[in-house]
Amino acid sequence: MDGGFPQNRVGLVSEIGLMEDSFPPGFENEAKNLAIDFDGVIHNDDKGFHDGTCYGLPIPGSIEAIMSLSQTFRIIIFTAKAKPSRPLVDGKTGTQLVWEWLDRYGIASYVAEVTAEKPRALLYIDDHALSFSNWDETLQSPVLNSLRKGLNVT
């Protein structure tokens, strides 16, 4: 380290002896990672969580989008289905179920990782997100204010 900090975090990992798996998914490739939510973005989950299975069809355009995006980005799928605390479904973890679904629709080879953690990425594609620029705009967001009214919060 020559008395200072390494120029990058991967250097820091080797200098201080941390295990790379102690970092969030995608750490080593964050400069090209694109994180995409599974349910509601790729997988149609119109029945809600249901029993944890991946029962839905692909969201229209999602297959082609992942194939196209994977030419430029390293695709990471993030989903609560992959949480280790979730119960097994037919003896399979949520991560296994997601990989099987991706394989069934021919896109498993375009995806680098499936994780329950928020991965390090350049951009996140999620159906339950609000784009942030500053707090004044965020607090005035029609979407946020609509949710507040629905929850009777002023």
PLM features per residue range, with description:
Residues 2-154:
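HAD-like aspartate-dependent phosphatase fold
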